[in-house]
Amino acid sequence: MKHFFLGLLLCMLGTSTLAAQESDSIVMEVFRQKGYPFYEDNEVKLLPTGREKYDDLFACVRSARDFIHMDYFKFQQDSICHALFDILTGKAREGVEVRIVYDSFGNRFSDLPLRKPYLDSLRASGKRIEEFDRVRFPWINHLRHRNHHKIAVIDGEVAYTGGMNVADYYLRGKPRVGEWRDMHMKVHGPMVNGYERVFEDMWWRTTKERLDSTRYLSTGHCDGHTKMAMVERVPKKSGKAIRETYCIAIDNAQHIIQIINPYATLVKSIRKSLEHALKRGVRVQIMASTTGDGPVTPDVVGQEMHKLMKKGAEVYYYDGGFHHSKVMMVDGLFCTVGTANLDARSLRFDYEVNAFIFDRNVTAQLQDIFYCDIHKHCVLLTPDNWKYRFPLKKRVSGRVFSSIKGFL
């Protein structure tokens, strides 16, 4: 909220023209004051299904000439992972440099973790595959500061990022939750260098090996017109970055805020920003999933959504499976797509990276997906159906586990 009131005060004093500006211009100005890096002249392609992501990514990997860098929370050892690594093996034999980082915690608690014999065979074929912060007993020492990235950079020309790990449930769903929905994107342009820097930093943290940035950063030109800001959460360095930028965007919204997030247990600062937006008359629409991949998180999310509903927010429950997307649209003017959930783990502990995209066409595409899902798969939460959707057992669970939601 302090960012909103600072802008308001400057307007009242006549020292700023923010009052005549739309929210995207105000947010860009505040981001620049805060030092968040901007990249202009990009092209963005949204990839709203697992099939679209993997078809596009695999084609790009097959055409790689120089290097392939991948940094993922987890690679699930299943059919889609085998298909990807088979392509990467072929590229490594052609002389393409292949470097892969995966998170130890994400792998260990995967349904189908990468096993040592398989990893050894992959490494023997010429790929560098490294495990970030190996989990050892006692595991509790490694629960914080996990690598939650989902990034691929190919030849310094193309980057992929968003909510999808590498697993076939993005194509086939899961028995307990049904279809697994998510949002990824493909980026051309200067922003690719930002993702390459994120990879190089994680590579160093994992291997203590410094990569020569001049070797991997692109100086090429892109004819795109999309302006993007990179927001990276690095523990002990930029720990407040994701929640700060979310709050700046929400605090300066003028008309409508639309959010899809799978684990919206919410930290206090974001919840307060949303409540103040509602008081200003801003329309707030949030899409939450009826099911989830954890036993109690949906109950805690339900408590938060109930509170916001009572404050005037429109809460839509997605019944078409599990919506794992991490996106927000503001005023139809700008949006964010990234890896961060709206929970304490993403906002206070893990390594995360989000892109804020200042492009009305990209934002409109996300809004179209949002409205389509509302029409086809969602039910509006009301005081009447709240008790039906959340019977006493779930309400008690939500209240009890809300007290420790910072650890969920």
List the predicted regions and their residue ranges.
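Sec-dependent N-terminal signal peptides
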Residues: 4-13
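Charged, low-complexity intrinsically disordered terminal segments
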Residues: 17-408
